[in-house]
Swiss-Prot record:
Localisation: Cytoplasm
Identification of the protein by name: Type III pantothenate kinase
Enzymatic class: transferase
One MF term in the entry's GO annotations: metal ion binding
Binding site for ATP: 6-13, 133
Length: 261
């Protein structure tokens, strides 16, 4: 079985695949101080609840945008699961698509993994919007190559920043308000976040589509993923599909392609 690890700025997600079938998935908040042993304690316990043991794992793949966790997660695989993980971005790890940007080394591993899964599942050209700590719009052109994209602050990060710098503004939950005009501070902040963010998403997607396919032929497919994408997709008609497993599936595909070489 394959252990796939996606280390993001907000969460680290683990999944076990048996062939194409996902046997289990677990999530922990990202903490740069967490050690390999600490990861192992809770992960092995949760795997056991699914009838899985470390001996079931024969290979691993890691995508990390958190340098402080790349080492501990590599050690986790080596010391507790008996395998050295394939790491997205390492020399020799092939993605199966070309990275056509000014400096390919700058592209975040998570963005590339999403692109790999998207182009294997949906017809290009396409855009993957991933709403997390940051919000990324990742573009795959009509040839199936990664063509760049847009990076913006995520909604939680934006709200936290507003709360920190404006003394009288409270922390609020992110939700879709019933109306645009807020009758109080909390309602006004929630409206500003939801509708402002929805407007940003639609504005950026409209402009990307115009650049990527000026005539609309071929049409551009928009795929949403990430923890908050479903909420914001409800406010927009431009997201064609929501694919919660996109990143994990991309990791499985990358491992599959490289292991077969």
């Amino acid at each position: 079985m394959l252990l796939a690890i996606d280390a993001g700025n907000t969460n680290v997600v683990f999944a076990v695949f048996e062939g194409d079938v996902k046997r289990g998935q677990w999530r922990v908040s990202t903490d740069g101080r967490r050690t390999a042993d600490e990861h192992a304690v809770w992960l092995v316990a949760l795997m056991a609840m699914k009838g899985l043991t470390p001996k079931d794992i024969h290979a691993a793949i890691l995508s990390s945008v958190v340098p402080a966790q790349t080492g501990p997660l590599t050690t986790l695989c080596e010391e507790h699961f008996g395998c050295t993980p394939m790491r997205v971005g390492d020399p020799g790890v092939r993605l199966g698509l070309e990275v056509r940007i000014d400096n390919p080394k700058e592209a975040g591993a998570d963005r590339l993994v999403n692109a790999v899964a998207a182009v294997a599942t949906y017809p290009p050209p396409l855009v993957v919007i991933d709403i997390g700590t940051g919000t990324t719009f990742d573009v795959v052109d009509a040839n199936g190559d990664f063509a760049g994209g847009v990076i913006a602050p995520g909604p939680v990060l934006s709200l936290d920043a507003l709360h920190r710098v404006a003394a009288q503004l409270p922390k609020v939950d992110i939700l879709r308000p019933d109306r645009v005009i807020g009758k109080g501070t909390v309602a006004a902040m929630q409206s500003g976040m939801f509708w402002g963010y929805t407007g940003m998403i639609e504005g950026i997607l409209t402009r990307i589509k115009a650049e990527l396919s000026p005539t609309g032929d071929p049409p551009v497919t928009v795929i949403g993923t990430g923890g908050l994408v479903r909420l914001f997709a409800e406010g927009s008609s431009l997201v064609d599909a929501i694919d919660a497993d996109l990143t994990l599936r991309g990791l499985r595909l990358i491992h599959q392609r490289n292991a077969a070489r």
